[in-house]
């Protein structure tokens, strides 16, 4: 949902939009809670409070102040990610298709012939990183840019088996127009940038697990971050390949040579980051034109020094000349060298050309060896061709997509590799490598071992759920890693499947109860955004590919009502109850009935079950930004930090009742996952709370009324307002609490309206209006370790007779309290109080 804050109403009506007027009788937190549970997508928030907007944004719900109608129109027609700290709105708006254009934030794409293969009459527009160049389109009080581009489709095409780009991009545009927006993917670029800038400023050692190509821009400016991936393809790995011949297959209609060079240079750069954690000088031989250097400089202040007889316009220092092996002495330490020398073929015949290429390959390799033979902190990426060669067995082979598969591949070596054992590799084996293997990731670092790191902050986004990881080892890592942000696939199946298919692999599934974390926040993508200063306008949908975000070591753990809080917890319930269910009271009715409380009079205002916990369990697929386990734990330890708002703390028994209701719901829905989740949350409640039951009571609290509107034959009809199991020495402690609650007890609006047979020969009258105070009293006794209340649900009633009677119904009648007392069962009254 998105909240657009206005000082005055608007005349125009928008679809899926609701108006909320700030309620001055409620504080900012209550207003935020009510807004978050509205069911429309767009909320026009009138007479707004800035504090309420802050609360919503911290909760991951995008809430933006609007001063002018053009702002309203811009934000209401599309989704966006909002940086509420720096006041920047990143639109995810594809309406630019109506201008017959596709967009890119990659400058190198504009230098290709891609426009020859677009839809008729269409053009390509460059918009800068994350749409930075579109800021001039929006003259707003906040910074605004459109981060939507078609780079995802362009890159997918490059790695696909499709050749016809026009058909491919047409299909992708149609898909985009007919399916829901992949909001997490779009906002993820904004999130990654914000996340790692924050972490680098707070932590000296950071480990990142499982990055993919889409992350490479973020890490260009963070050389200190240690990367772990799936490992490289080494020269020694070619021993598994059979010999093949030249294939000559075209991969792309438009020229993607710039992309190939781009990612190979980044491959090289990340390799030296991994070893030395500093930004190097980047040397390039055969550099022209390298338009992609412009893209690199959008993300980081890296320095390029280049050699080529042709121009390299974005180089910091370009030598318009050839580079010879004798020039290697000009190259400094703490550098990377990218050798891409290849003479143009011009009119040479095939045999002559092949001889030239092989000679240049040997020359390139010799330059690389000489560069690596002296000095320190060096890595080299060198262009090779398929030929009989001796190569270091530990050197890394690269074959990123290029316009055509021919004879070229690349080799990355560091100083140690260049001195390692060399193996003879036949030309046919190298052709087999070129023909069959595409390097899909610029991150080729070693795999991460699932073990706790003492001094590092571990980030593992979408990397650990794969079933090639041992599930128990993943759980152990998350439980024990002190500082981390780790995601795992949430189990949102209905049959409690332990693993689910994803693309060509399987992922383990998890629930929050699988982890035993202390001081860790377990939330959704939306909830995690709020922690790092971002919010989003479109909540995550239960697609089957959703993840738990687990933040360990965060200083926001105790801020329970600020981050990963209960905002939107009733939204799914409202959507169902006010549209599909038998009555809008269905949730209240079901919760009472499933706990054997059959008095439904006033059930919507006096419910015996925690609606928060119930909704968090049965609708967890729709909103798990609320960290239920943390909420339970902080209440159980009395460590919850509440910033504001009228806050009702549930008694632990109310939480138990909620689990029982959710379990009943799950059985009716045949939802095995919710069934397990409910059982495990109930077990967790019993673990963190020391709940004892007065199932063998020796004292009770009684309430005598001045008026009983029914006939009765018991001596003193009264309401048993809870039973206790205490020693006589604890009576004074009970009396202290009763005196503390005196005013609230006598203020209760107690009513009755019918009689019924509680069981055979027990004739009783119903009592309404006391449950809220009962649970508050329960909490007070619990905190003083006084055993109060039984394991079965408290059903307030007045016993009228110990014989069978005809039930009667009367108009709701108020019962006036005469006095309240504490009495020993089968004994004397030890305390009483009147108003």
Curated annotation (Swiss-Prot):
Keywords: GTP-binding, Host-virus interaction, Hydrolase, Inhibition of host innate immune response by virus, Methyltransferase, mRNA capping, mRNA processing, Multifunctional enzyme, Nucleotide-binding, Nucleotidyltransferase, RNA-binding, S-adenosyl-L-methionine, Transferase, Viral immunoevasion, Virion. It comes from Rotavirus A (strain RVA/Cow/United Kingdom/UK/1975/G6P7[5]). InterPro entries: VP3_Rotav. It comes from the Viruses. Residues 556-692 are annotated as: GTase/RTPase activity. Residues 246-428 are annotated as: 2'-O-methyltransferase activity. It is found in: Virion. Interacts with VP1. Interacts with VP2. Residues 693-835 are annotated as: 2'-5'-phosphodiesterase activity. Belongs to the rotavirus VP3 family. This is Protein VP3. The keyword Kinase does not apply. HAMAP family: Rota_VP3 (MF_04124), Rota_VP3_A (MF_04128). GO terms for cellular component: viral nucleocapsid. Multifunctional enzyme involved in mRNA capping. Catalyzes the formation of the 5' cap structure on the viral plus-strand transcripts. Specifically binds to GTP and displays guanylyltransferase and methyltransferase activities. Has affinity for ssRNA but not for dsRNA. Capping activity is non-specific and caps RNAs that initiate with either a G or an A residue. Together with VP1 polymerase, forms a VP1-VP3 complex positioned near the channels situated at each of the five-fold vertices of the core. Counteracts the host innate immune response thanks to its phosphodiesterase that degrades the 5'-triphosphorylated, 2'-5' linked adenylate oligomers produced by the host cell IFN-inducible 2',5'-oligoadenylate synthetase (OAS). The host RNaseL is therefore not activated. The active site is at 718 (for 2'-5'-phosphodiesterase activity), 720 (for 2'-5'-phosphodiesterase activity), 797 (for 2'-5'-phosphodiesterase activity), 799 (for 2'-5'-phosphodiesterase activity). One of its GO terms (biological process) is viral process. Residues 171-245, 429-555 are annotated as: N7-methyltransferase activity. GO terms for molecular function: GTP binding; hydrolase activity; mRNA 5'-cap (guanine-N7-)-methyltransferase activity; mRNA guanylyltransferase activity; RNA binding. Its EC number is 3.1.4.-, 2.7.7.50, 2.1.1.56. It catalyses: a 5'-end diphospho-ribonucleoside in mRNA + GTP + H(+) = a 5'-end (5'-triphosphoguanosine)-ribonucleoside in mRNA + diphosphate; a 5'-end (5'-triphosphoguanosine)-ribonucleoside in mRNA + S-adenosyl-L-methionine = a 5'-end (N(7)-methyl 5'-triphosphoguanosine)-ribonucleoside in mRNA + S-adenosyl-L-homocysteine; 5'-triphosphoadenylyl-(2'->5')-adenylyl-(2'->5')-adenosine + 2 H2O = 2 AMP + ATP + 2 H(+). Contains a bipartite N7-methyltransferase domain, a 2'-O-methyltransferase domain and a GTase/RTPase domain. The C-terminus contains a phosphodiesterase domain that degrades the 5'-triphosphorylated, 2'-5' linked adenylate oligomers produced by the host cell in response to IFN stimulation. Its main location: virion.
């Amino acid at each position: 949902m998105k909240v657009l804050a206005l000082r005055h109403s608007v005349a125009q009506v928008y679809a899926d939009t609701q108006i909320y007027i700030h309620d001055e009788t409620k504080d900012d937190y209550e207003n935020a809670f009510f807004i978050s549970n509205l069911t429309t997508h767009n909320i026009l928030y009138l007479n707004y409070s800035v504090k309420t907007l802050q609360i919503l944004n911290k909760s991951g719900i995008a809430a933006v102040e609007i001063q002018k109608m053009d702002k309203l129109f811009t934000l209401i027609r599309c989704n966006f990610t909002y940086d509420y700290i720096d006041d920047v709105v990143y639109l995810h708006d594809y309406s630019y298709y109506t201008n017959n254009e596709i967009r890119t934030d990659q400058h190198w794409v504009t230098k290709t012939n891609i426009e020859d293969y677009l839809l008729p009459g269409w053009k390509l527009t460059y918009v800068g990183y994350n749409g930075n160049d579109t800021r001039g389109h929006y003259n707003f009080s906040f910074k605004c840019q459109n981060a939507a581009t078609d780079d995802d489709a362009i890159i997918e095409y490059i790695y696909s088996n499709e050749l016809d780009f026009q058909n491919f991009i047409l299909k992708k545009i149609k898909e985009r127009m007919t399916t829901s927006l992949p909001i997490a993917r779009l906002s993820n670029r904004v999130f990654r940038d914000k996340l790692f800038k924050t972490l680098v400023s707070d932590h000296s050692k950071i480990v990142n697990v499982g990055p993919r190509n889409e992350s490479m821009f973020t890490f260009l400016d963070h050389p200190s971050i240690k990367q772990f991936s799936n490992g490289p393809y080494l020269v020694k790995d070619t021993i598994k390949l059979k010999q093949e011949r030249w294939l000559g297959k075209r991969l792309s209609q438009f020229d993607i040579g710039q992309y190939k060079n781009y990612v190979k240079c980044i491959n090289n750069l990340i390799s030296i980051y991994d070893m030395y954690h500093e930004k190097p000088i980047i040397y390039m031989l055969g550099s022209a034109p390298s338009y992609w250097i412009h893209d690199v400089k959008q993300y980081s202040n890296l320095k390029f020094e280049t050699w080529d007889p042709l121009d390299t316009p974005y180089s910091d220092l370009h030598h318009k000349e050839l580079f010879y092996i004798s020039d290697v002495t000009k190259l400094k330490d703490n550098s990377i060298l990218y050798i891409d020398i290849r003479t143009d073929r011009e009119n040479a015949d095939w045999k002559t050309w092949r001889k030239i290429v092989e000679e240049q390959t040997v020359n390139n390799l010799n330059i690389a060896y000489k560069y690596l033979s002296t000095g320190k902190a060096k890595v080299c990426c060198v262009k090779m061709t398929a030929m009989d060669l001796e190569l270091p067995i530990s050197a890394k082979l690269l074959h990123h997509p290029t316009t055509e598969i021919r004879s070229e591949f690349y080799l990355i070596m560091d100083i140690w590799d260049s001195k390692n054992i060399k193996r003879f590799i036949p030309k046919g084996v190298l052709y087999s490598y070129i023909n069959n293997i595409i390097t899909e990731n610029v991150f080729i670092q070693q795999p991460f071992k699932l073990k706790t790191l003492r001094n590092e902050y571990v980030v593992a986004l979408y990397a650990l759920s794969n079933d090639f990881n041992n599930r128990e080892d993943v759980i152990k890592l998350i439980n024990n890693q002190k500082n981390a942000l780790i995601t795992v696939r949430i189990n949102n199946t209905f049959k409690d499947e332990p693993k689910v298919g994803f693309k060509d692999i399987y992922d383990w599934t998890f629930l929050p109860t699988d982890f035993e974390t202390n001081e860790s926040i377990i939330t959704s993508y939306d909830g995690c955004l709020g922690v790092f200063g971002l919010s989003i306008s479109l909540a995550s949908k239960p697609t089957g590919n959703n993840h738990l975000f687990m933040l360990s070591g965060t200083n926001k753990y105790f801020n329970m009502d600020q981050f990963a809080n209960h905002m939107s917890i009733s939204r799914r319930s409202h959507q169902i109850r006010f549209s599909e269910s038998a009555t809008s009271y269905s949730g209240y009715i079901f919760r009472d009935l499933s706990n054997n409380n059959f008095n439904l009079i006033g059930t919507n205002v006096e419910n015996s079950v925690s609606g928060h916990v119930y909704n968090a369990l049965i609708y967890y697929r729709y909103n798990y930004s609320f960290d239920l386990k943390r909420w339970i734990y902080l209440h159980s330890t009395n460590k919850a930090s509440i910033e504001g708002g009228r806050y009702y703390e549930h008694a632990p028994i109310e939480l138990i009742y909620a689990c029982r209701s959710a379990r009943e719901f799950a059985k009716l829905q045949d939802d095995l996952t919710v069934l397990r989740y409910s059982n495990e949350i109930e077990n967790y409640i019993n673990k963190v709370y020391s709940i004892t039951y007065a199932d063998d009571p020796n004292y009770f609290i009684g309430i005598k009324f001045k008026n009983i509107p029914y006939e009765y034959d018991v001596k003193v009809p009264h309401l048993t307002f809870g039973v206790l199991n205490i020693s006589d020495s604890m009576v004074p402690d009970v009396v202290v609490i009763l005196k503390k609650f005196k005013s609230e007890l006598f203020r209760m609006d107690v009513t009755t309206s019918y009689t019924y047979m509680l069981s055979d020969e027990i004739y009783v009258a119903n009592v309404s209006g006391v449950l809220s105070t009962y649970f508050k009293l329960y909490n007070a006794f619990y905190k003083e370790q006084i055993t109060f209340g039984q394991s079965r649900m408290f059903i307030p009633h007045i016993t009228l007779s110990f014989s069978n009677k005809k039930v009667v119904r009367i108009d709701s009648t108020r019962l006036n309290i005469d006095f309240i007392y504490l009495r020993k069962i089968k004994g004397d009254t030890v305390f009483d109080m009147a108003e």
